[in-house]
Structures are given as C-alpha cells and as structure tokens.
C-alpha cells in the first residue's frame, strides 16, 4: 500500500487512512502506522497471551485467605461457608494448573472438588458463586435446575448449562473449560422417594443422572446456536473436566432429617427430654449434614459423591440485613445513591429507615433478595418525579416512607445555587 495519496498527504500503510483521519501517524523505514492499527495490534497480542495462558493453565491461583477477603467485600457474614468455598476453589484451580501443560502426576490422580451450597432463599448462595468467578476472572454461567430434563424430553437439556458458559466466554472454548457454572434450586430435582425409582423421573432423578457426567468431566457436544441437536449440524466440543460446578439449594426439610438422626442415638425417655430441651436451630442442624442425610432427602449417592465440598449458609438476621444495605462495595443503598447522583441529587437514608427496610425484608422471608423490593416500592414515586425536577438537591428517606408509604423529604436548591449552576453550564458550553 502506498504511504502517500495524490496530494502528498501521508497515509497508514496498513489501513490506508490519511493523517487527518487519525490521531497519530508513526513513521518507520518507508512505512507508517496509525494509532488505531497500533491499538488493534495490541488487542490481538493481548488476546493471544490470554489464550496461551489459558492453554498452559499458568494463571495465578489466589490463596484461600485472599479469596475470603475478596468475598468479604461483597458478601456479609457466612464466615464458615466462605472458608469452605475459598479452600475448595483454591484446590480446584491448583489441580487445573497441575493438569495443564502435561503436568499430570503419574502416581497421584487429583479428582474434582465440586461444591454444594445449602442455605435458605436470599442467604447469598448465588452472590457467592458470582463473586468467586469475578475474583478468578473466569467466565460464569448460571442455570436453574427446575428447567432441566433428560435429553429427548420437553425442557432444557443438561448440556445447555455448558452451552450457557460457552456463550458467556464468547465461544472461546479454552476460556469456557476453566469457567464456573452455578446450578440453583438443586434440591428441587430430588427423587420422589429414597429408594431407586422403577418409573421414569425425567425432571428429578433423571436430571441427577444426566448431570453426573458433566460434573465429573466429559466432552460435551454442543450445538453452536443452542436448541435441539440434529445430525446435520456441526458441534462444538467442550471438556468439562476443569469446569468448577457449584450447586445450591434451600433444602427445606433437611434439618428435620438431620434432627431425627442426631436425636435417635439415645433411646427411651431420655431421648424425649433431650429433644425438648436441646432442640437446635435449623442452621446449626444443617451444619451437621452428612451424605446419608442428603440421600434420604432425595439426592442419589453418585450425585452426592460428585459434591465433596459442602458449605452451609445461615439464615440472615436483622443485623446482617442492615449490614448488607450499607457495607458491601456494591451495597443496594450505594447503588441507589449513584443513580440519584446522575440527576445531581444526594440521596440519604436515616438509621430508622434502614432498620425498617431490614425488618420488612425479614417478614417477607426472602433474605437479602427482599431488600431491593422494599426499597423499589418505597421510592417508586420519588424516582419517577426527580428526573423532571431540576431544583432538588437532596432526598431524605425516613422510616415513614418505608412503613407508611409517606413522601420523602425533599431539600431544594437556593436561588444562588441555581444561578451558580447556570453560569457553570454556560462556561462549559462556551469552552
């Protein structure tokens, strides 16, 4: 490509753009390259480096303490669950690094440590899984176990879970093969009875059977655009051996199974006295969960065996919900304050208002998930009105707004403040 046009103006030797069409044109021996082509080259090199790193498995694995510290920034409480998760994730990706680049150990075969999260709705299961993917900078996909069925039946194929991860990786197979998949509502696919079923259970035990292979590690043949498979189409092959699977559920009633096991150890009158005097809370009982309890709940033994790391999340109390409102980096109140700041308005919450939000969410029994719903309802009118008003500088939410649906207090700008803003706007437009 020529480096000059008919008028003698210099051009990029690669894309052909003139020097007036680009910000910079850098000269070399007989050639020129523009800033846009340099950026493109850097992007290509960076992508290639990332791909090589993914293939070699040389990415740095954070220490368990570092993973927990990162989780602390986004998830309130659940200390024991965070530790369990941090150790399991650290060991999983150490194993991934060891298996990559021909480092397989001849004498010791390291198996996968997929993770089971047990906890009530809104206790932070999904957020923990999402945050783990963020700290590791790996692709993340989420699926709902209740929508899954065995292949060939109406519903979503189990392999579509892996397809979601591939799509989240922009169809980069190497990236996808080191990603994280979270399957929610796993307790809803428990089999109907503790004994093996003689009839077809396509959305319960059948889904557990179908999940076994991808949990342990298999090569999944995925249709590029999703949907049902047909013989004529080409498939993308994804190896699930190094994908970390985190599954979670509320497991309502599991505490009763554990209580029955732990209290039946003593027989006769003493057992009744002990049961009435020392009944433990649901969260404490769940922390004593054993594989046999999960089997009685309805998970098949083979499925339980693929989930060696179990983390139990406690229900959130009022104080924990209060912390969730204000403490995390992405706290809900901070998100709303950011939204209001786009309109030049400062949003404030009184201490009593925050407590009222926590109490209302607690009554709804939806955990942290209920906090946003309470605030959305309480602030609907003010969020509707504020963009149409240019003279409001502050909005104060008190407990009456939350409990009684009262209007929040609005603080208006003075005439001097409005004039100063108008003058500042004129200066910016003239500049």
UniProtKB/Swiss-Prot annotation:
Molecular function terms, GO-annotated: ATP binding; ATP hydrolysis activity; ATP-dependent protein folding chaperone; protein dimerization activity; unfolded protein binding; zinc ion binding
Residue ranges of domain ClpX-type ZB in the record: 1-53
PROSITE patterns named among the record's database cross-references: CLPX_ZB
InterPro entries linked to this entry: AAA+_ATPase, ATP-dep_Clp_protease_ClpX, ATPase_AAA_core, Clp_ATPase_C, Clp_protease_ATP-bd_su_ClpX, ClpX_bact, P-loop_NTPase, Znf_CppX_C4
Chain positions recorded as Zn(2+) binding sites: 12, 15, 34, 37
Alphabetical UniProt keywords: ATP-binding, Chaperone, Metal-binding, Nucleotide-binding, Zinc
Keyword Secreted attributed: no
GO cellular component: HslUV protease complex
A biological process from GO: cell division
Residues at which ATP binds: 120-127
Function: ATP-dependent specificity component of the Clp protease. It directs the protease to specific substrates. Can perform chaperone functions in the absence of ClpP.
HAMAP family referenced in this protein's UniProt entry, alphabetically: ClpX
Subunit structure of this chain's protein: Component of the ClpX-ClpP complex. Forms a hexameric ring that, in the presence of ATP, binds to fourteen ClpP subunits assembled into a disk-like structure with a central cavity, resembling the structure of eukaryotic proteasomes.
Homology family: Belongs to the ClpX chaperone family.
Name assigned to this protein: ATP-dependent Clp protease ATP-binding subunit ClpX
Lineage: Bacteria, Pseudomonadati, Bdellovibrionota, Bdellovibrionia, Bdellovibrionales
Annotated gene: clpX
């Amino acid at each position: 490509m020529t480096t000059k046009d008919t008028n003698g103006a210099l051009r990029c030797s690669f894309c052909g753009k003139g020097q007036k069409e680009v910000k910079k044109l850098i000269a070399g021996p007989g050639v020129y390259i523009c800033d846009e082509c340099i950026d493109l080259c850097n992007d290509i090199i960076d992508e290639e480096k990332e791909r090589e790193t993914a293939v070699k498995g040389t990415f740095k694995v954070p220490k368990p303490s570092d993973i927990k510290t990162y989780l602390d920034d986004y998830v309130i409480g659940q200390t024991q669950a965070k530790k369990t998760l941090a150790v399991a994730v650290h060991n999983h990706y150490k194993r991934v690094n060891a298996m990559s680049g021909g480092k397989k150990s001849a004498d010791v075969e390291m198996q996968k440590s997929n993770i089971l999260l047990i906890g009530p709705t809104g206790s932070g299961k999904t957020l923990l899984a999402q945050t783990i993917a963020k700290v590791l900078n790996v692709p993340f996909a989420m699926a709902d176990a209740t929508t899954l069925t065995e292949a060939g039946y109406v519903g979503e194929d189990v392999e579509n879970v892996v397809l979601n991860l591939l799509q989240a990786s922009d169809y980069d197979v190497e990236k996808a093969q080191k990603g994280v998949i979270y399957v929610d509502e796993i307790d809803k696919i428990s089999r109907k009875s503790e004994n093996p079923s003689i009839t077809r259970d396509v959305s319960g035990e059948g889904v557990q059977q179908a999940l076994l292979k991808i949990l342990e590690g298999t090569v999944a043949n995925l249709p590029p655009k999703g949907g049902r498979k047909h013989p004529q189409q080409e498939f993308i092959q994804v190896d699930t051996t190094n994908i970390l699977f985190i599954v979670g559920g509320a497991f309502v009633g599991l505490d009763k199974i554990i209580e029955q096991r732990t209290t039946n150890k003593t027989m006769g009158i003493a057992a009744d006295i002990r049961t009435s005097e020392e009944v433990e809370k649901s969260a404490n009982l769940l922390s004593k969960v054993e594989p046999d309890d999960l089997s009685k709940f309805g998970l098949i033994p083979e499925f339980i065996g693929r989930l060696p790391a179990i983390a139990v999340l406690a229900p959130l109390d009022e104080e924990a919900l209060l912390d969730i409102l204000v403490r995390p980096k992405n706290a809900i109140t901070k998100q709303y304050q950011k939204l209001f700041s786009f309109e030049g308005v400062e949003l404030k919450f009184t201490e009593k208002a925050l407590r009222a939000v926590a109490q209302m969410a607690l009554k709804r029994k939806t955990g942290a998930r209920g906090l946003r719903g309470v605030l959305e309802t309480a602030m609907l009118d003010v969020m509707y009105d504020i963009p149409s008003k240019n003279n409001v500088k502050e909005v104060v939410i008190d407990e009456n707004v939350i409990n009684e649906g009262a209007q929040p207090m609005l603080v208006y700008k003075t005439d001097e403040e409005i004039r100063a803003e108008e003058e500042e706007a004129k200066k910016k437009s003239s500049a």
